[in-house]
Amino acid sequence: MKKLDIDEVKAFIEAQSPETKIYIGGDSERFPIGNDWYADYTLAIVVHIDGKHGAKVFGEVQRERDWDQKKNRPRMRLMNEVYKIAELYHKLHDVLEDRQVEIHLDINPDERYGSSCVVQEAVGYIRGMCNVVPMVKPRAFAASY
């Protein structure tokens, strides 16, 4: 699976105008391999050039064991997404300081969805770790990469 080249992403962002907007998001999918459950975590960085032109998307998929016991309330997997997004934000922080940045979480606050079980925890974690108020579904388009 392809890994993000952080230096390449930073160089691309630095070459853009200050009006360029950055969106960082993530998603995951759970699936079985044999008797064990795994999750593919997709991380995305969308660089919206000048905030009005085209965009360049950088992405990475990480596969890990999924230890969640409740498929319909995937707290551990969803928080793992959030931790990975915060880590990615911090890797890019030095080139993001003077730019408009949004963090998009694949979490739906509607209680009909399993992801609603972590809304407050996830939003609080991103606010505390990144000093950014994250977007959640349905406004979190970068979390649907």
Regions found by a protein language model. Name each.
Residues 29-32, 52, 75-76, 108-114:
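Short acidic, S/G/P-rich loop/turn micro-motifs used as interaction or catalytic elements
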Residues 33-37, 111-119, 145:
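A short acidic (Asp/Glu
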Residues 63-96:
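Acidic helix/loop or adjacent segment enriched in Glu/Asp that either coordinates divalent metal
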Residues 1-30, 92, 97:
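Basic, amphipathic N-terminal segments that precede the first structured/catalytic domain
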Residues 1-4, 8, 13, 48, ...:
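Hydrophobic alpha-helical segments at protein termini of multi-pass membrane proteins
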Residues 23, 98-107:
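Short glycine-rich phosphate-binding loop at a beta-alpha junction
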Residues 24-25, 31-57:
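Acidic, metal-ligating active-site segments
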Residues 105-140:
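Short, low-complexity, polybasic intrinsically disordered segments
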